[in-house]
From Swiss-Prot:
It catalyses: (6R)-10-formyltetrahydrofolate + 5-amino-1-(5-phospho-beta-D-ribosyl)imidazole-4-carboxamide = 5-formamido-1-(5-phospho-D-ribosyl)imidazole-4-carboxamide + (6S)-5,6,7,8-tetrahydrofolate; IMP + H2O = 5-formamido-1-(5-phospho-D-ribosyl)imidazole-4-carboxamide. The keyword Amino-acid biosynthesis does not apply. The gene is purH. Pathway: Purine metabolism; IMP biosynthesis via de novo pathway; 5-formamido-1-(5-phospho-D-ribosyl)imidazole-4-carboxamide from 5-amino-1-(5-phospho-D-ribosyl)imidazole-4-carboxamide (10-formyl THF route): step 1/1; Purine metabolism; IMP biosynthesis via de novo pathway; IMP from 5-formamido-1-(5-phospho-D-ribosyl)imidazole-4-carboxamide: step 1/1. It comes from Lactobacillus delbrueckii subsp. bulgaricus (strain ATCC 11842 / DSM 20081 / BCRC 10696 / JCM 1002 / NBRC 13953 / NCIMB 11778 / NCTC 12712 / WDCM 00102 / Lb 14). The IMP cyclohydrolase activity resides in the N-terminal region. GO terms for molecular function: IMP cyclohydrolase activity; phosphoribosylaminoimidazolecarboxamide formyltransferase activity. Its EC number is 2.1.2.3, 3.5.4.10. It holds the Pfam family MGS. GO terms for biological process: 'de novo' IMP biosynthetic process. Residues 1-144 form the MGS-like domain. Keywords: Hydrolase, Multifunctional enzyme, Purine biosynthesis, Transferase. This is Bifunctional purine biosynthesis protein PurH. The lineage of its organism: Bacteria, Bacillati, Bacillota, Bacilli, Lactobacillales.
Length: 513
């Protein structure tokens, strides 16, 4: 007769699985609550205490940490000396372990969890058994996921045991589980200790889906979600219509959400290839849409749209007229949703709770060859009070509002970034050029006939030379916002004074790559 050790916190589907083991001549060793469930189901079990000859102690903290358990798991059956040691100490080999771990993740996700509660839900004995069984997978089957119950039983019923290939696969899966489990504990305790740059960094994510392809069709791709999901994330959005999200869809939608959360008035952000092609705000969402659309009616085709208010019918009918990849909003009126779905089976319509948009943000990571860059997200809260006017001309209140709008927009534009705007919408966006003057030329060219005495300009970084200010002055720009900090700042200030431009320094740069 073979022996299985069963000790789980999640008891779903457990009884049928264990009954299958018993039917195939396994005796069952179990602990605590698991044993009670199996006993109540009429399944004969042996308590761990009967195996070890030692009771549970320290409120259950020590149950299975015993040579009679780990010797039975780690002994190599092909080595005569190991077999002799088992016989000498009367240790019975264990052939299968079914374990899942204390719900540490679920515990720390509770809003009012205490450190003491979290600590008590750090499993010690479970991971120890998982690791012992996994290390000795040549002889022991480790089962940590109820999704594997059926396959394990099927192989046992057919061949008397699982295959070596299956045991190796299950062992790798089990080590992934313990690694992820430890990573969450490490992350939680590191945050509690106030450490921001630990000497070791282990991140853990859960596979959400395999994607059709990556950034390009020849690239394979998978979507993983943070093991502690963030509420304000495209990955938490409810999809109401359309095809599955692509790799590029998710990146654009993420950037659109980052951008739209900057604004408090009804706002529409149109994102294309990680750059805003149009941002509009107004007293109503429809008005905001009109302004975002007119900002660049060409580039918005095939774009990703983020809105920060519930979508009404009037706005929906206007969006429905053009091809869009994604619409994401806090909610939709019933008739608005129906209108968007009409003859648009592929349009991805997403609903996301915007009430959590200001929750604490996690670190950003970017992979580089051989490493990982980690930084805080660029979520600095800025306002007029943080700015310094450095020119003879001073911005009017309307210009200040326009400058703040443009500053929020340029923050989400790829560097080198220039945005021309008023306090209602972007007029022109220049993104991603190796030199700043070229980005400015693109932005002003896009603004074209919309340039008037209300137009202002924002730059994500300082002007290295005065040419950008001169170009702006020649095209009628009357107010500029930029970080300042160049060794040639005075040249730019002098040029602004020459053209009567009000220029403010923020002291903060917003590179985005």
């Amino acid at each position: 007769m073979k022996r299985a050790l069963v000790s789980v916190s999640d008891k779903n589907n457990l009884v049928p699985f264990v009954k299958g083991l018993v039917a195939n001549d396994y005796e069952i060793v179990s602990t605590g609550g698991t044993k009670r469930v199996l006993d109540e189901a009429g399944i004969p079990t042996i308590s761990v205490e009967d195996v070890t000859g030692f009771p549970e102690i320290l409120d259950g903290r020590v149950k299975t940490l015993n040579p009679y358990i780990h010797g039975g798991l780690l002994a190599r059956r092909e080595l005569p000396e190991h077999v002799a040691t088992l016989k000498e100490h009367k240790i019975t080999p264990i052939d299968l372990v079914c374990v899942n771990l204390y719900p540490f993740k679920q515990t720390i996700e509770k809003p009012d969890v205490t450190l003491a509660e979290a600590i008590e839900n750090i499993d010690i004995g479970g991971p120890s058994m998982v690791r012992s069984a996994s290390k000795n997978y040549r002889d022991v089957t480790i089962v940590v996921d109820q999704a594997d119950y059926d396959q394990v039983l099927a192989e046992i019923e057919k061949d008397g045991s699982t295959s070596l290939e299956t045991r190796a696969r299950l062992a790798a899966k089990a080590f992934r589980l313990t690694a992820s489990y430890d990573a969450l504990i490490s992350q939680y305790l590191t945050e509690k200790a106030g450490e921001t740059a630990p000497e070791k960094l282990t991140l853990t994510y859960d596979l959400k889906e395999a994607m059709r392809y990556g950034e390009n069709s020849h690239q394979k791709a998978w979507l993983y979600e943070d093991a502690l999901p963030k509420a304000f994330s495209v990955l938490q959005a409810e999809q109401l219509n359309g095809k599955e999200l692509s790799y590029n869809n998710i990146k654009d939608a993420d950037e659109a959400l980052r951008c739209v959360r900057e604004f408090s008035k009804p706002t529409v952000v149109a994102m294309k290839h990680m750059n805003p092609c149009g941002i509009g705000q107004g007293n109503t969402l429809e008005e905001a849409w009109d302004r975002a659309y007119v900002a660049d009616p060409v580039s918005i085709f095939g774009g990703v749209i983020a809105l920060n208010r519930k979508v009404d019918l009037a706005t929906a009918e206007k969006m429905h007229k053009i091809f869009l990849e994604i619409i994401i909003a806090p909610d939709y009126d019933e008739d608005a949703l129906a209108a968007l779905k009409t003859k648009k089976k592929n349009l991805r319509i997403l609903k996301l709770d915007f009430s959590k948009k200001d929750e604490a943000t996690s670190k950003e990571t970017v992979s580089v060859m051989g490493g990982l860059l980690v930084q805080d997200q660029d979520v600095l809260d800025e306002d007029f009070a943080d700015w310094e006017c450095v020119t003879e001309a001073k911005p009017t209140q309307e210009q200040l509002e326009s400058l703040l709008f443009a500053w929020k927009a340029v923050k989400h534009t790829k560097s080198n970034a220039i945005v021309v705007a008023n306090n209602e919408r972007t007029l022109g966006v220049g993104a991603g050029q190796p030199n700043r003057i070229d980005s400015e030329k693109i932005a002003i060219d896009h603004a074209a006939e919309a340039l008037d005495d209300r137009a202002v300009l924002a730059s994500d970084a300082f002007f290295p030379f005065s040419d950008c200010v001169e170009y702006a002055g020649k095209h009628g720009i009357k107010a500029i916002v930029q970080p300042g900090g160049s060794v040639r700042d005075q040249e730019s200030i002098d040029m602004a004074n020459k053209y009567g431009i009000a220029m403010v320094f923020t002291g903060v740069r917003h590179f985005r790559h």
